[in-house]
Amino acid sequence: MEKLTLPAPAKLNLWLHITGRRADGYHELETVFQFLDHGDELSFSLREDGVIRLHSEIADVPHDSNLIVRAARKLQEQSGTRLGADIWLHKVLPMGGGIGGGSSDAATTLLALAHLWQLDWNEDRLAALGLALGADVPVFVRGHAAFAQGVGEQLTPVDPAEPWYVVLVPQVSVSTAEIFSHPELTRDSLPLKMRPVPEGNSRNDCQPAVEQRYPEVRNALISLGKFTEARMTGTGSCVFGAFPSKAEADRVLALLSETQTGFVAKGSNVSMLHRKLQSLIKKSSS
């Protein structure tokens, strides 16, 4: 049977402010999400027997705990479909990197299976289901750069500049739960009242706690900071900096390659997943 193959793009938090902590322990955030033209790739094939089978194992992640499998089963359960799927994952994005690998895989799974199973589900419904899997899943479902509030699920589309980025990948996996429970984490940034959202005078409130705990992240920030403003994305560990051209970004990554691992990618306000889905829809309707 023919496979449906779709990307699961990375994201950056261009900045991230923590404005409070809720009674349930979750943190209130303000952040800007932007996508990268770089990510994992998933392939899907229809099954008639209702079985969900992920054929790509990830070290230390049991099959049934994988967000891809959980997303597929949740959609299956809530839609009432009797169909299943075989799923293959080509993993590129690091785990614990702050660039959305697991959340992006889950969102691609929801959108792909809604298409494959011919469900009449709109983005709102898929995003609401995605939120139950993780706070970052809705932005990947919607596929447009966004100013996010709440726990990250209240999304307002924005269109920041789309530069080339150098993304450094320190060889550590940062625990989001550990960072959000850090006693010295800033939790009282003032909510922004200006619109559009200012790009200057911003920061990542998680960065100091991560730098303190993970010297590899601090070293990456120092290395990239010699060439441009360097910032951490999410709760780390990945670090990024913007450049006006691919040539300049490639040059800087080459200079850093002896001590740092990373990649170069274009920023994008419309995710490559949504661009691919739109082209599929156009083909099927023509």
Swiss-Prot record:
Q: Where does ATP bind?
A: P94, M95, G96, G97, G98, I99, G100, G101, G102, S103, S104
> EC number(s) of the enzyme?
2.7.1.148
Task: Give, as one word, the top-level EC class.
Answer: transferase
> Which keywords fit this entry according to its UniProt record?
ATP-binding, Isoprene biosynthesis, Kinase, Nucleotide-binding, Transferase
Active site annotation, chain numbering: K11, D136
| Molecular function GO labels | 4-(cytidine 5'-diphospho)-2-C-methyl-D-erythritol kinase activity; ATP binding
Q: Which Pfam families match?
A: GHMP_kinases_C, GHMP_kinases_N
Among the GO biological process terms of this entry, one is: isopentenyl diphosphate biosynthetic process, methylerythritol 4-phosphate pathway
Its recorded reaction(s) are: 4-CDP-2-C-methyl-D-erythritol + ATP = 4-CDP-2-C-methyl-D-erythritol 2-phosphate + ADP + H(+)
The family database entries (SUPFAM superfamilies) matched by this protein are listed as: GHMP Kinase, C-terminal domain, Ribosomal protein S5 domain 2-like
Q: Tell me the pathway.
A: Isoprenoid biosynthesis; isopentenyl diphosphate biosynthesis via DXP pathway; isopentenyl diphosphate from 1-deoxy-D-xylulose 5-phosphate: step 3/6
Q: Which Gene3D superfamilies match?
A: 3.30.230.10, GHMP kinase, C-terminal domain (3.30.70.890)
What is the protein's known function? Catalyzes the phosphorylation of the position 2 hydroxy group of 4-diphosphocytidyl-2C-methyl-D-erythritol.
Q: Which family does it belong to?
A: Belongs to the GHMP kinase family. IspE subfamily.
Record PANTHER family: 4-DIPHOSPHOCYTIDYL-2-C-METHYL-D-ERYTHRITOL KINASE, CHLOROPLASTIC
Per its record, how is this protein called by name?
A: 4-diphosphocytidyl-2-C-methyl-D-erythritol kinase
